[in-house]
Amino acid sequence: MSTDLGPEFLEKYTAIENNLKKRFMRKPNISEATEEFSNLAVQCELAEQPPFAGICYLEAAKCESSIGNTVGSAEYLLMSARQFMKAELKLSSLKCVSPGRENLEAAISSYLHAHSKYPEKSPLRVAVITELAEALERLGHHSEAIQYYRYCLKDYNSVPETTGCELNILSKIATIYLKKENYAEALKIFKIIDSAAKVLDYKPYIQRCEVNILLLYLIVQPSPDNVTTEANLVKRYTIVSDEEPCLNEEYPIHPELFLHLQSVLFACKTNDIKALINLNTEMKDFLAIEQMDLMHVLIETYETMT
């Protein structure tokens, strides 16, 4: 597939713009210009030139906005944003960094402009910003991704019945903090998720949070003034009973995993690194990848303390 747009692209683009400017002779045909810009954008996509496609979709969005077609304008803005982001992702994959972040800034601008076009209580507002945040996360711009994920949470407050989606966004934020090795902030977010999940009875979230909160507590070792949730959790795992632990509605933790976590807590209290290493192997069938990573961090943390 050819990636050369040739001189025809600039000629076509200029011709469309010139037709729009002929206001003294006749009223410009906005719908026709929109279609022409859209068709030119498709040609750019086929030629694998996403920045030029983004520019053309942006012009189409302006045309739709000029005739009061808010929805049409938003759709073209979103198409523009995706093309600019595609260009940025391609540069990132090639390890090419643009100091001016031209494509990325154009993408962010188009995403935010599209977001502003949708009604305040529309779920599409949240979807647009979520898409932007996810793209930023893929690019490794974690702080910016968190910023826009938090922006999503503000939008969710005005959209009915979105609590489950809010948990998903909070989960994404917590995951980024884990990637950044900011375990204190990750612990705070998982505590928020845990509280909400218990109210909503979202069992998968409850189990994930319980394991993560315990491991993060042991890694971070926060001050006694900030450990109310963790203290109650640790108390549950400190109690030794002759009865075998069982699954229940409030704490859907597998009995064997419960015993392993109990052993982890005791191993940390006694600085038994060998026991932690053995438990890490024994627990692998019960832990998600992020929790296995936390176990490795926990072992490293206590190795440096001995």
Identify the meaning behind each predicted range.
Residues S2-G6, A15-Y76:
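Internal amphipathic alpha-helical repeat/solenoid segments
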Residues P7-E11, P28-S31, E48-P51, V71, ...:
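Residue signature of alpha-solenoid helical repeat architecture, marking inter-repeat boundaries
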Residues K12, I16, E36-F37, P50, ...:
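TPR repeat positional signature
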Residues I16-K21, A41, G54, A61, ...:
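Conserved small-residue packing positions in alpha-helical repeats and bundles
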Residues I30, P50, T70, L104, ...:
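TPR-repeat structural position
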Residues L78-M79, A87-Y205:
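Eukaryote-skewed repeat-based solenoidal scaffolds used as protein-protein interaction platforms
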Residues Y149-K154, T162-T306:
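Structured C-terminal portions of repeat-based eukaryotic scaffold domains
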